[in-house]
Amino acid sequence: MALFYVARYPGPDAAAAAGPEGAEAGAHGRARALLERLQSRARERQQQREPAQTEAAASTEPATRRRRRPRRRRRVNDAEPGSPEAPQGKRRKADGEDAGAESNEEAPGEPSAGSSEEAPGEPSAGSSEEAPGERSTSASAEAAPDGPALEEAAGPLVPGLVLGGFGKRKAPKVQPFLPRWLAEPNCVRRNVTEDLVPIEDIPDVHPDLQKQLRAHGISSYFPVQAAVIPALLESAACGFLVGRGGYRPSDLCVSAPTGSGKTLAFVIPVVQALLSRVVCHIRALVVLPTKELAQQVSKVFNIYTDATPLRVSLVTGQKSLAKEQESLVQKTADGYRCLADIVVATPGRLVDHIDQTPGFSLQQLRFLIIDEADRMIDSMHQSWLPRVVAAAFQSEDPADPCALLQRRQAQAVTAASTCCPQMPLQKLLFSATLTQNPEKLQQLGLHQPRLFSTGLAHRGLEDTDGDGDSGKYAFPVGLTHHYVPCSLSSKPLVVLHLVLEMGFSRVLCFTNSRENSHRLFLLVQAFGGVDVAEFSSRYGPGQRRMILKQFEQGKIQLLISTDATARGIDVQGVELVVNYDAPQYLRTYVHRVGRTARAGKTGQAFTLLLKVQERRFLRMLTEAGAPELQRHELSSKLLQPLVPRYEEALSQLEESVKEERKQRAA
């Protein structure tokens, strides 16, 4: 760093009075005082900023190298430094040389001794024009930190901590932001034994339907039915051709435990809304994931439409396409005549009829009911819903201005969109494990939806994870949960002990694959003493229907199944559900154990867990809000009497598997 003093000519009088020697001595004294003041300030700032570095520098000074700036070699003329003949540029200084002693006077117009080399006649960087006689303090202050005085005060450089020093801290949990209809549902009571509502308390139900209910032994509604039936009847209060007040009714979503009466909650209002129809058209369409469940729902519709002119058609692929076409449409001289008011179908078969059945029309569709909605959403890759919606809003003659009830796609509610009334399409979603993920529900295109949910499901909204499945499922009140720690080899022995020693008459056992189900069936059959059957896709629809009927009648004691029967199948009298293979997902467990403790009855669920599965499974159920699981340990002494017959059955199982492989190869 070089401090300089610009000697300006003060005038002839002042120069004559002071003389050349006095002026030069005064300039040197002022420059020295300014330099000392800047050096002291630099030391104070350095000590305030890095007190620890100065101590570390003193201790590590011999081991560290001092950084020095690269020096430039400059050509020095023979003229003395400080004389008017000296060249422009910086002067080299010896190490440890005092800057104040070497600061010298420069001529006006020459660059300062601490600045970079510039063209002759240009002002030095960082300085500004000043009045004659004033010192360029701003330029000196800017140049001060770069000089040797600051280097001496700073001392040697000490390496510091660049990365690290971060403490472990748990990330805050982000609360999901849900739409209002999901965050504030219509809460439904979940106790189906104490919160019953008498039939007379809902007078809007048609007297003929009330008579049908009493004839089948129903004198009270379950809480879900008491909440959903009035809401659906209100949306069809002005008839099924137009919505209430001419507006499109809201879509409904119902999330309630298994066995809480969801099927009857939509059967009663749909049948009542269509009682006034004159011409037969497809007004209600029920879409379900499995053939067995579709057959069960079709049976309920047939019961309550028996004394009415309404007709129900089942379309699941159990019959040939031609047979199903005969139950849907009839060809006449004037065209095609519809033969069904209510159609119960599976997605794949429904799309087949939309594409291949002449005269099959959904243009008069009023109710679209999606049961087991969470599984139906997972099968949206089949694109069945867009096909149904496109068929429902397809117009025969879009250019006809006289079509008063011409169906159009739903738009924003404006004066123009409501001036011409049209028959609305109302969507109804039902499931025990209805997802609350807005991204998935958006695929359904719901219109101003309303959610009916149990209190437990509403509580779980705050604990919804990325899939939208955690902490929001409700279990039947009368269900008792158990888990049995065991090894992989002792699993069949545990199942045999539960069936033979504990005296359960109807046991439903679930496995994760069709192969595991078949092998366990062969093993129990070889063991003997148990009426066992297998329920899987190995059998056709007729055989599966016969097996379920025998199981309900008590002719089959143990039914080994895959998850095919875990979805909505209402099997009467199931006392015990055994999870032979622990379910991987929460909603799979909910549907499995929901086959027992239905309609207010009691039931038990046992899950066989390996040691590596216990922690994850228990945490999953705890987050779901399930009641406390009871640990049920079986000692080797209890299973020892079954071991001899079990070993014989294993040898027979091996032979049976070999024979089946030979048959497949042949």
UniProtKB/Swiss-Prot annotation:
So what does this thing catalyse? ATP + H2O = ADP + phosphate + H(+)
Q: Where does ATP bind?
A: 256-263
What spans are recorded as compositionally biased (Basic residues)?
A: 65-75
Q: Which GO terms describe its molecular function?
A: ATP binding; ATP hydrolysis activity; RNA binding; RNA helicase activity
SMART domains reported for this sequence: DEXDc, HELICc
PTM-bearing positions, type Phosphoserine: 83, 103
Q: Where is the composition biased (Low complexity)?
A: 10-28, 49-58
Q: What protein is this chain from? A: ATP-dependent RNA helicase DDX51
Q: Carries keyword RNA-binding?
A: yes
- Organismal lineage: Eukaryota, Metazoa, Chordata, Craniata, Vertebrata
Task: Note the PROSITE patterns from the entry.
Answer: DEAD_ATP_HELICASE (PS00039), HELICASE_ATP_BIND_1 (PS51192), HELICASE_CTER (PS51194)
Q: What EC identifiers does the entry list? A: 3.6.4.13
State the family it belongs to.
Belongs to the DEAD box helicase family. DDX51/DBP6 subfamily.
Stretches with biased composition (Acidic residues): 97-108
Q: Which InterPro entries match?
A: DEAD/DEAH_box_helicase_dom, Helicase_ATP-bd, Helicase_C-like, P-loop_NTPase, RNA-helicase_DEAD-box_CS
